[in-house]
A protein has these predicted regions:
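N-terminal secretory signal peptides that target proteins for export/translocation
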Residues: 1-4
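Bacterial N-terminal signal peptides
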Residues: 6-19
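Cationic-aromatic interfacial patches
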Residues: 29-172
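Cleavable N-terminal signal peptides
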Residues: 15, 25-26
């Protein structure tokens, strides 16, 4: 299963391990007369079982619940000796509303909990009032449901490691038991769940949009546009009318009525451009193959896309900081964020489909002006050696030098002295380094945030690539459009570095390391659906194929006995 339950258990074991100071151990045998005794007997009958089944439901936290109840001397958490507490109804309503979070109440014992409550409150005619075993079962299910649901709200329902999501952002740790205790003590489960829910504005926006798109689906969604011919200004006919209606349904067309509904007029062209812009397409106002494909994505698929990206928000810590850099891989963009708002943005180039840029975070501490490029060994072996074999002037033309040895023992080698025919894609015992200058692959600057992936931001001499709509050309690092502007921003607190002094340094072909006075977090993330600060819903293609396995994992049923 893909549920992140081991993580939950680890957190809760640490939380509960200390017990309650000053209370003597329970040594009396259970009488099975009260819910408390039944709960105790459930766990003590055969030690701590690998699986605890309650009312036909698998208790997911069977390793943790015994400790939770031991700490409270096995007293029920959700009922008194005869009936459920009022807090239960609030929690049930919250589970019924789990779909607002892109989650399912059924994954948290909702049906069984409601059945038990029904038996307790409305016993069938001729039946005795349900005994304490019903209250015990209800208590165990409610506690398990709360711990699992709050964990999913805080950390996500799916563990990204299990689906190879290439997501390495450091997640948060939370005291779930303390959260439960607070809810019980304050009789306010709603507040406790709010504290567990992602507090990022980006998450809240997607939650609102999820409700809107579900409403579209309930009203029948939007129809599929037939035919493959492109549609452009001054065209007319039934396909144009269908296009207009399609854009009305998704909110891209301002007016629901038009006197010339089957004519591709200026108003319709503007609506097409608006649609293209929020789907990452070239905004030419023409419905070509790419635009038609995006238009024909059904609303149900967009709903799944929204749910997938809400899950990614849950994978993040509750705060990213007041100031940080944010790269959205799927949008090919870098943003400078202050108080969750963009203060600068620029186009970016990310890794090729077979050299994908991972999602992770790290702290940027320095930048380098006029950097050398130490060519990674796999690039040297697989890409450059074949080029050198074809053109013996390749190294000179590209200002690349050859070195042997490592670190202090490294020394330059004359490439003419080497037998290049002996080198293959699997064997090249030398190192290549490209000198600083206009041909350097890193451009004029690189921005460093040490990480295990050896990924960093850098300039590029090939500026024309930023004009492409889809920008997947790198070996995994991120090329940025406005390196000088970013350097100015990062060095603003260092009076020695202004735009002028940076430009002066660029004119000297010597690499120079500059410490960033106020280090900044860098988040490299993967969003295929989000809502802009102005409320515009954005969708992007799943360029690395990461949405599908996550969507499938979210659809999986919870464990069964």
């Amino acid at each position: 299963m893909v549920f992140s339950l081991k993580l939950i258990a680890a957190i809760l074991v640490l939380t509960l391990g200390s017990g309650i100071a000053g209370l003597p151990p329970i040594v009396a045998a259970p009488s099975a007369d009260q819910p408390r005794d039944i709960i105790r007997n459930r766990f003590e009958a055969s030690g701590i079982p690998e699986k605890v089944v309650c009312w036909g439901e698998l208790i997911c936290e069977s390793e943790v619940l015994p400790r939770f109840y031991e700490n409270r001397l096995f007293w029920p958490a959700w009922s008194n000796s005869s009936e459920p507490l009022t807090i239960v109804d609030g929690f049930v309503h919250a589970l019924e509303d789990a779909h607002h979070e892109g989650l399912r109440g059924a994954d948290y014992h909702l049906d069984s909990i409601k059945s038990l409550l029904g038996e307790l409150r409305m016993p069938q005619a001729g039946q005795k009032r349900p005994g304490p075993s019903i209250l015990a079962d209800l208590d165990l299910l409610l506690t398990d449901a709360f711990l699992i649901y709050t964990s999913h709200l805080l950390n996500g329902r799916v563990d990204p490691v299990t689906i190879r999501a290439e997501w390495y952002v450091k997640s948060q740790k939370a005291d779930l038991v303390a959260l439960l205790k607070t809810a019980l003590d304050s009789n306010d489960v709603k507040k406790a769940l709010e504290n567990a829910t992602s507090n990022h504005e980006g998450y809240a926006r997607l939650r609102r949009v999820l409700a809107h798109y579900r409403g579209i689906a309930e009203r029948g969604g939007w129809g599929k546009l037939v035919g493959k011919q492109k549609m452009a200004k001054r065209d007319s006919g039934e396909r144009i009318l269908a296009l207009r209606n399609r854009l009305i349904h998704s909110g891209d067309f301002g007016s629901k009525e038009s006197p010339e509904g089957d004519l591709f007029d200026d108003e319709l062209e503007s609506a097409v451009r608006r649609f293209q812009g929020r789907h990452g397409l070239a905004q030419d106002g023409v419905v070509g193959p790419a635009t038609l494909e995006a238009l024909n994505v059904p609303v149900e698929e967009r709903i799944r896309q929204i749910e997938v990206n809400m899950e990614r928000w849950r994978w993040l810590p509750q705060t990213l900081g007041t100031r940080y850099l944010l790269v959205n891989i799927a949008n090919f963009e870098l943003g400078v964020m202050e108080d969750s708002r963009h203060v600068m943005s620029m186009r970016a180039i990310v890794g090729k489909p077979y050299q994908r840029t991972p999602a992770f975070n790290a702290e940027m501490t320095y930048l380098v002006v006029n950097p050398y490029w130490n060519v990674p060994s796999d690039i040297a072996r697989k890409e450059m050696v074949p080029l050198i074999k074809k053109d013996h002037e390749y190294l000179r033309k590209n200002s690349i030098r050859v070195f042997s040895g490592r670190n202090s023992a490294r020394k330059e080698v004359d490439p003419a002295d080497l037998d290049w025919s002996s080198f293959t894609s699997g064997y090249f015992p030398y190192f290549l380094r490209q000198d600083a200058g206009p041909k350097n692959a890193l451009g004029s600057m690189k921005f460093m945030f040490p990480n295990r992936f050896n990924v960093y931001l850098h300039d590029t001499p090939d500026k024309a690539l930023f004009n492409r709509t889809v920008r997947q050309f790198s070996h995994g690092c991120i090329r940025i459009e406005k390196a000088l502007e970013l350097a100015e921003y990062l060095l603003a607190k260092d009076s020695r570095w202004t735009r002028e002094t940076l430009l002066e340094s660029l004119n000297v072909s010597v690499d120079r390391v500059i410490k960033i006075p106020d280090p900044i977090q860098v988040y490299i993330l993967y969003w295929t659906a989000w809502v802009d600060e102005d409320g515009t819903v954005q969708f992007r293609n799943d360029i690395y194929g990461r949405d599908k396995p996550l969507a499938e994992a979210l659809e999986e049923k919870p464990p069964s006995p």
